[in-house]
């Protein structure tokens, strides 16, 4: 590296250069003596330095002195005292600064200083590949002040008032540290600002791409040609690139565009630096003195063999300078020798004249040999041969090859052969040589050779570099041919399907060109093999040659790196073969007696045969003839699942537009039960079969397949058989289906057995209840159809009939019996109930047209056909449904119907009772619905609550002997009242015509006060307990002629005297032996009076009429009503058996 600051560039009078320890600063000047200034007297004073610069400038620029123009002075270093050169007693200038620090002084808006411009113009920036001449020293040079200094460098960094010459393969720019141990990491100190990193950027030469590149290391990045480059990026550099790091701009200059004043009269222009031409730079580094211009005729050398003279050089970071009588004027690298630690300082030393002269002769002789060898190599080059030969001839000082002396050529050839023989003596492994070559490519210039043998080894490395570059050039040419062949193949493959008269000629032309390229490629490959064979095993070198290592990536096509990595140029893997290891087991000495030791075979070393390390390889064999044209590269298309077509409604056939009304499980079962699915089907096959069987799924959108998949995998009636590829085969699991069917059959049998046992248990309960009822009524032989308002009195039915129906007994007693409120509706002969019964009314409410026909016409029949009555019944039904829904009950339909029917019956009975009191007659329901609907709703609510409580078993239980309910007032009226309202009694009696089956004894709500023949009876009258077992059966399907006797409870009459509490009903049996007339009391009686005979009754009440007479045989009742107490036992058992059979059947049906 070279660092020139200010006017110091143009000084020809300075002998020693002011340079830092880590800087390859080289100032090559002529030997003009300056009588006024000496280097040893330099101090830190700025005035002395400026005076020195003025003196040097006056000697160099006489024209400027004539014009008396002031010359700008530049400071060499920054204010850091460590960066200022120190003067020692022996004239050795040292510096603690590791890096060159540009002093960026303000220029007051001016451009680059004139001194810098003059320096860059006068200092010939000579590329390494041209005009690198070694000037031999002569005695006349002491007085020669016209020789201009020359600086050889790879590139140059032009700062605003600072110039940096790049003379190594790698330059690091950044900010130096105050720590002396870290200062060798930075070559160019840009600034002390924190925006610049310690190692901010690195400029290096890339041998792979053969160009300079810059790699950004700082986190703040940099600008290259006003384009920001962030950290971690590496971009190529060309001549003239403007770089800015922080606020420090500079320009990168390459020698290709640098003007050369000395060669303006020559035709050839400067070429860009080629790394293979590093020989000139290396030879200049070894040249310690300038050499004169070579004459057109080269002088013959006195000896045939190169003399090996020791070179007196310092490895302790010092540059050796000749004595003042022999000044040094040479190319810049010869004035600066970099060590591996980059710690070179300027120093002066005196050596004997004889040693210096011998060393110069040896170096010149070696340089001449190298040039001739390069010339012989250049003759074999096919590309750029003329430029290379002209360059070599120029270095040799001749204009053509013919001017070279043949005798000298033979001599030189002999000397070259001796050098080659000397190289052959130091042959090494090719791997070591190649590794050393890589080290050489990645290192900077290093001059640590102290003898001639080291110099010759360095020349062998340079030769190896040259051959490597030629090898890489051939690789690049082969690559270019391959790319051209690829393009031709593509064009031919495109033209082949379009062959016609027009394209035939073009195709033939492409074929011809292709053959030529293939022939050229074979030649290049042959030449490459020759170069590979001639890549000799070069002598080893212990240290790198070129200073700092540069991070240079090897080219991808370089044969050197491929061979280092185990690959040859053909692409085959070359397996490393280490020497086979020898495993030697140590033999221990045995001290026991020989007789106690068994004979053992001698221990032998275990060796491994070499054949085990030979890597096997194989290549495919084919009998097919290679095609003439390359196969077009077929792109691998990934299988993409095409979406299903969406059918419109018009595209779907009419029968397949509606979804089948069956489940997926049934579909899958139908598919798997076919013969085709005997061995199992995969899921996709099942879905396809479903599409065929049910075409609706062929046209519908996707998504139902997931349900099929889930149903198959998680339903136990399907089982997996085996795998077909990666999918399972599914079939019906017959074992599981049979097992589940058996379980179902067993459950059904168990349910039937439980139902039968329950029926038997219910039968036992009913028999027990019947027995208890029979025991509680031993003397009630005659049916109780009349209730006396007094206790302990019984009135025969015929006597009651004479009082209640004296005017109409002859017409109605033959076909019906008026048993009061609780008379039975079933005759012995199976006659139907009256037309005005509650069953007929409920049938009308439900709209049932099959109302049972009546056997006789009664006065209440016209009331059922009245529209007002129907309207009232509809109102009751609607209101009752509203009340039932408001309770949010969860009973089944049969239970709900039973509850509603029971509530309707109770409501109608209560309404008729209230209407009778109010004198409404037959139209009591209609009257109350029209006049007081809120009372009807209240009665409905009470009746529904009662029905629900009875059903749930919450109602209170009555005593074991059922009490006789009290008669309603209309049943206890006098004969005159009965005649005045002839239809009231039948209407009231119809309320009890519904077949019911209540619990044993449960009283209903009582009517508060009732009048019997004008007498106020304060106690509540017990009403019948109406329990409806099935509303539907009782209303519409139960046989009217033969109702079930167990559904009717024997009612009891209960009359409450005035002195008793109205909430407690009193059960009193009706006497049968004292027939007395019914008086009309005027006030409550303390005791019941004795009844006399009723008028027209006869002497006394005898036993009832014969039971066997049919109805209508006599004027009185043919037989009393049949109750549970007086009904024959065999009939009750038969009817109970029929009812239990029906209930058992219903329970079994529910269970199933």
Curated annotation (Swiss-Prot):
Residues 659-756 bind DNA. Residues 171-229 form the FHA domain. Residues 87-101, 328-358, 804-826, 851-863, 973-987 have a biased composition (Low complexity). It is found in: Nucleus. Residues 449-537, 734-777 form a coiled coil. GO terms for biological process: nucleoside catabolic process; nucleotide biosynthetic process; positive regulation of transcription by RNA polymerase II; rRNA transcription. Residues 64-83 have a biased composition (Basic and acidic residues). Residues 296-307 have a biased composition (Basic residues). Residues 996-1006, 1072-1082 have a biased composition (Pro residues). Its main location: nucleus. GO terms for cellular component: nucleus. PANTHER family: DIADENOSINE 5',5'''-P1,P4-TETRAPHOSPHATE PHOSPHORYLASE, DIADENOSINE 5',5'''-P1,P4-TETRAPHOSPHATE PHOSPHORYLASE 2-RELATED. In complex with IFH1, acts as a transcriptional regulator of rRNA and ribosomal protein genes. The FHL1-IFH1 complex is targeted to the ribosomal protein genes by the DNA-binding factor TBF1. This is Fork-head transcriptional regulator FHL1. The gene is FHL1.
């Amino acid at each position: 590296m070279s660092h020139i600051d200010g006017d110091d560039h143009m000084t020809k009078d300075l002998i020693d250069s002011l340079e830092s320890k880590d800087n390859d600063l080289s100032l090559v000047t002529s030997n003009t003596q300056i009588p006024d200034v000496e280097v040893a007297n330099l101090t830190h004073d700025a005035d002395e330095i400026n005076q020195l610069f003025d003196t040097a400038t006056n000697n160099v620029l006489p024209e400027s002195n004539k014009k008396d123009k002031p010359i700008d002075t530049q400071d060499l270093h920054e204010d850091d005292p460590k960066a200022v050169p120190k003067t020692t007693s022996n004239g050795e200038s040292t510096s603690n600064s590791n890096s060159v620090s540009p002093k960026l002084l303000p220029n007051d808006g001016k451009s680059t200083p004139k001194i810098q411009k003059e320096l860059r113009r006068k200092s010939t920036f000579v590329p390494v590949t041209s005009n690198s001449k070694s000037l031999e020293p002569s005695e006349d040079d002491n007085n020669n002040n016209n020789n201009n200094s020359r600086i050889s460098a790879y590139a140059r960094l032009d700062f605003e008032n600072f110039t940096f010459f790049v003379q190594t393969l790698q330059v690091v720019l950044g900010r130096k540290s105050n720590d002396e141990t870290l200062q060798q990491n930075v070559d160019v100190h840009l600034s002390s600002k924190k925006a610049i990193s310690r190692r901010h950027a690195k400029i290096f030469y890339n041998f792979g791409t053969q160009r300079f590149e810059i790699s950004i290391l700082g986190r703040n990045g940099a600008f290259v040609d006003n384009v920001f480059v962030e950290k971690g990026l590496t971009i190529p550099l060309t001549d003239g690139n403007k770089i800015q790091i922080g606020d420090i701009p500079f320009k990168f200059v390459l020698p290709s565009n640098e003007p050369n004043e000395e060669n303006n009269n020559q035709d050839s222009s400067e070429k860009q630096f080629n790394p293979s031409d590093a020989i000139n730079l290396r030879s200049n580094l070894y040249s310690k003195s300038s050499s004169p211009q070579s004459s057109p005729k080269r002088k013959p050398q006195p000896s045939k063999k190169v003399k090996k003279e020791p070179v007196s050089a310092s490895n302790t970071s010092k540059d050796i300078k000749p004595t003042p009588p022999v000044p040094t004027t040479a190319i810049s690298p010869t004035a600066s020798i970099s060590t591996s630690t980059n710690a070179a300082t300027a120093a002066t030393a005196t050596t004997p004249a004889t040693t210096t002269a011998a060393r110069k002769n040896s170096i010149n002789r070696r340089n001449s040999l190298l040039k001739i060898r390069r010339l012989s190599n250049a003759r074999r080059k096919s590309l750029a041969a003329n430029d290379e030969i002209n360059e070599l001839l120029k270095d040799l000082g001749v204009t053509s090859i013919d001017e070279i002396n043949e005798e000298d050529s033979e001599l030189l050839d002999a000397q070259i052969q001796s050098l080659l023989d000397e190289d052959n003596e130091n042959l090494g492994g090719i791997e070591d040589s190649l590794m050393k070559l890589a080290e050489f490519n990645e290192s900077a210039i290093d001059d640590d050779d102290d003898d001639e043998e080291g110099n010759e080894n360095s020349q062998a490395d340079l030769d190896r570099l040259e051959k490597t570059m030629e090898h890489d050039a051939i690789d690049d040419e082969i690559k270019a041919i391959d790319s051209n062949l690829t393009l031709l193949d593509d064009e031919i493959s495109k033209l082949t399907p379009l062959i016609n008269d027009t394209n035939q000629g073009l195709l033939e032309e492409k074929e011809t060109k292709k053959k030529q390229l293939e022939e050229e490629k074979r030649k290049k490959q042959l030449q490459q093999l020759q170069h590979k064979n001639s890549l000799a095993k070069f002598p080893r070198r212990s240290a790198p040659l070129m200073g700092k290592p540069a991070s240079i990536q090897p080219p991808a096509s370089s044969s050197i790196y491929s061979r280092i990595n185990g690959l040859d140029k053909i692409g085959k893997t070359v397996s490393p073969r280490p020497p086979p290891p020898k495993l030697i087991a140590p033999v221990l000495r045995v001290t026991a007696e020989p007789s106690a030791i068994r004979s053992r075979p001698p221990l032998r070393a275990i060796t491994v045969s070499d054949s085990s390390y030979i890597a096997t390889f194989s290549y495919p064999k084919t009998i097919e003839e290679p095609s003439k044209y390359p196969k077009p590269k077929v792109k691998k298309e990934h299988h993409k699942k095409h979406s299903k077509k969406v059918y419109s409604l018009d595209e779907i056939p009419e029968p397949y537009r509606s979804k089948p009304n069956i489940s997926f499980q049934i579909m899958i079962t139908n598919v798997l039960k076919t013969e085709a699915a005997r061995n199992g089907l995969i899921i996709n096959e099942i879905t396809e079969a479903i599409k065929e069987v049910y075409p609706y799924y062929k046209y519908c959108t996707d998504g139902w397949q997931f349900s099929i998949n889930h149903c198959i995998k998680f339903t136990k009636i399907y089982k997996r058989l085996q795998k077909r590829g990666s999918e399972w085969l599914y079939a019906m699991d017959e074992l599981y289906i049979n097992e589940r069917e058996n379980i179902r059959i067993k459950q059904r049998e168990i349910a039937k057995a439980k139902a039968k046992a329950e029926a038997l248990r219910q039968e036992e309960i009913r028999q027990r209840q019947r027995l208890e009822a029979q025991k509680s009524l031993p003397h009630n032989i005659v049916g109780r159809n009349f209730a006396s308002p007094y206790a302990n009195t019984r009135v025969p039915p015929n006597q009651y009939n004479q009082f209640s129906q004296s005017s109409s007994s002859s017409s109605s007693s033959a076909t019906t019996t008026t048993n009061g409120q609780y008379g039975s509706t079933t005759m012995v002969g199976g006659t139907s109930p009256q037309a005005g019964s509650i069953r007929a009314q409920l049938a009308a409410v439900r709209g049932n047209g099959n109302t049972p026909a009546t056997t006789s016409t009664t006065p209440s029949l016209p009331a059922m056909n009245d529209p007002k009555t129907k309207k009232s019944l509809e109102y009751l039904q609607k209101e009752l449904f509203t009340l039932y829904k408001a309770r949010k009950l969860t009973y089944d339909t049969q239970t709900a119907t039973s509850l509603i029917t029971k509530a309707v019956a109770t409501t109608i009975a209560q309404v008729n009772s209230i209407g009778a009191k109010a004198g409404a007659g037959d139209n009591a329901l209609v009257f109350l619905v029209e006049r007081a609907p809120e009372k009807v709703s209240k009665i409905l609510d009470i009746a529904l609550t009662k029905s629900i409580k009875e059903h749930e078993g919450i109602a209170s239980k009555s005593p074991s002997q059922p009490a006789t309910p009290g008669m309603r007032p209309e049943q206890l009226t006098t004969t005159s009242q009965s005649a005045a309202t002839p239809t009231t009694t039948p209407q009231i009696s119809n309320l009890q015509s519904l077949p019911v089956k209540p619990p044993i004894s449960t009283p209903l709500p009582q009517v508060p006060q009732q009048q019997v023949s004008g007498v106020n009876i304060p106690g509540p009258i017990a009403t019948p307990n109406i329990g409806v077992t099935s509303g539907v059966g009782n209303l519409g399907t139960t046989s009217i002629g033969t109702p079930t006797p167990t559904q009717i409870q024997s009612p009891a009459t209960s009359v409450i005297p005035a002195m008793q509490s109205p909430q407690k009903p009193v059960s009193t049996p009706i006497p049968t032996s004292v027939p007395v007339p019914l008086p009309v009391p005027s006030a409550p009686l303390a005791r019941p009076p004795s009844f006399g005979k009723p008028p027209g009754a006869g002497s006394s009440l005898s036993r009832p009429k014969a039971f066997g007479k049919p109805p209508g045989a006599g004027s009185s009742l043919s037989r009393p009503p049949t109750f549970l107490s007086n009904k024959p036992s065999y009939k009750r058992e038969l009817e109970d058996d029929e009812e239990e059979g029906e209930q058992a059947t219903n329970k079994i049906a529910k269970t199933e």
